[in-house]
Amino acid sequence: MKEKTYHTRCGMIHYWASVSNPDALTLVFLPGLTADHRLFDKQIQHFENRQNVIVWDAPAHASSWPFRFDFDLFDKAKWLDDILNQEGITKPVMIGQSMGGYVGQAYAQLYPDKMKGFVSIDSAPLQRSYVTAVEIWLLKRMEPVYAHYPWKWLLKSGSEGVATSDYGRNLMREMMLTYDGNQKRYAQIAGHGFRILAAAMEKDLPYEIKCPALLICGTQDHAGSCIRYNKAWHRNTKIPLTWIEGAGHNSNTDKPEQVNRLIEEFIANIL
């Protein structure tokens, strides 16, 4: 994997790529809010010698800093497309965990025919119809919660709340420690992320996935209403849904072998 950069009007994005044949399928890994490229370490290890792979530190996250919080979900999707173009990628398969899944759906809205596959890991649909007015109201008001909650407790609840395995919890803790001593930045990242998510939902766009897709969700995912959303998403769209038994919100870190196998089977069926 080679670390690379892409300049935007708001700052520089760091990403890692291993691309041997740009015209083959490329797995594009998109980490969730406040996580970084390390979230997918177990997936990268498994796939980097078999497939083209790309993973980023999302704007304002980890090494993609300093970065102005003057962008929305669609800017993220456009910058992602610019990065794929920079690498000559023609057949991206978006694999997004949580907020990363929302980036994938925004990408599908902007570039309906570019995406060759979509895997949602503990994410949820972007369509307005799935969320209540109260949920949207709350999303817009999360920053002060993260800013004023004692950091020690935030670290504990943040890492223990998203994973059930020691590996998954320790990894989330490590990723959160990137912001140790700068809780304001952590709160800004989280608050801004939730606000741009709410704004994308309020746009009330179709966010239709026109390519092959797969939903993955941990049975112990207690982040927001992920389990409820995934049941409804599957019911309404008929996109296949696989439950990861005993896994939390970062199910790819709790049961990496199972998630890797699911991704492998999924891409094998994409022409």
Which residues are covered by each model-predicted region?
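Post-His helix in hydrolase/transferase enzymes
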Residues: 253-267
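Conserved alpha/beta-hydrolase catalytic His-Asp/Glu region
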Residues: 129-131, 149-208
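Conserved loop-alpha-helix segment in the C-terminal half of the alpha/beta-hydrolase fold
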Residues: 214-247, 253
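Active-site loop/oxyanion-hole signature of alpha/beta-hydrolase fold enzymes
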Residues: 54-95, 261
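N-terminal cap/lid segment of alpha/beta-hydrolase-fold proteins
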Residues: 1-12
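Flexible "cap/lid" loop of the alpha/beta hydrolase fold
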Residues: 109, 116-148
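Gly/Ala-rich beta-loop-alpha elbow adjacent to hydrolase catalytic centers
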Residues: 96, 100, 104
